[in-house]
Design a protein with these regions (language model features):
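P-loop NTPase motor-domain active sites and their immediate coupling elements
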Residues: 24-231
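P-loop NTPase switch/communication element
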Residues: 1-18, 25-27, 119
């Protein structure tokens, strides 16, 4: 689904489709957020806008930092591969990244409790539910039923911060041809210039954290085998 945006000229890195590398990308985002807060502390500012304004005033445009939007198209794929790392990264970003100019959009077509965990949900206060198959799915997303009664085609329930109950609103239903025209327009504004250092970090994640990300129980299994003295 992100094949067209991949050429849109606005990406920091190519679209990441490998769940293992996506987990590493989230880890990079957490590290980037932490680094930005260090920059803010050094300059005695609180957020990205203040930092960038100061850098421009100091005639240091090369130190201006861009805003970053992190989009997870299917959370279930990541939670199958590295649930603990992904959950931790999402929670840290959701808690702290906004002031650093980093924003997180998480989507899934399988809103079960093992995908949208209680910890993730607690740290993402603003949520949207499109049409779902059951009241259970609606409650998993919004904490209330109702999304199972939506009509589709952009019909949604929006639960923003500060509202006691979800708002029913209509979002645009954009066809593939419309998407292609939008991407074509954005592409004409400039070609993508990827950050190779970020690409390299994602392509070769630290083995201590992600080298065996496909099996989180590897260490437990090794310990069990050593204890039983047989495999």
């Amino acid at each position: 689904e992100f094949a067209l945006p991949a050429i849109a000229g606005i990406l920091l890195v190519p679209v990441v489709t490998d769940p293992k590398k996506a987990a590493a990308a989230l880890n990079w985002a957490v590290n980037e957020m932490t680094q930005r807060y260090k920059f803010f502390a050094e300059e005695s500012v609180k957020d990205l806008d203040s930092y960038n304004e100061l850098m421009r005033a100091n005639q240091e445009p090369d130190k201006v930092l861009p805003k970053i939007v992190i989009i997870i198209d299917e959370l279930a794929d990541l939670m199958m591969v590295a649930p603990s790392q992904v959950e931790e990264s999402i929670c840290r970003l959701a808690q702290l990244a906004r002031a650093a100019g980093m924003h997180l959009i998480v989507a899934t077509q399988r809103p079960s409790v093992d995908v949208v965990t209680g910890l993730i949900k607690a740290n993402i206060p603003s949520r949207i539910a499109f049409s779902v198959s059951s009241q259970v799915d609606s409650r998993t997303i919004l904490d209330v039923g109702g999304a199972e009664k939506l009509l589709g085609k952009g019909d949604m329930l929006y639960s923003p911060v500060g509202e006691n109950k979800p708002l029913r609103i209509q979002g645009p239903y954009i066809s593939d041809s419309e998407t292609a025209r939008i991407i074509d327009f954005v592409k004409k504004q400039g070609e993508s210039t990827y950050d190779e250092s970020v690409v390299q970090t994602i392509e070769t994640p630290e083995k201590s954290q992600y080298g065996e990300v496909s099996d989180e129980l590897t260490e437990d299994a090794i310990a069990f085998i050593l204890k039983q003295k047989k495999a």
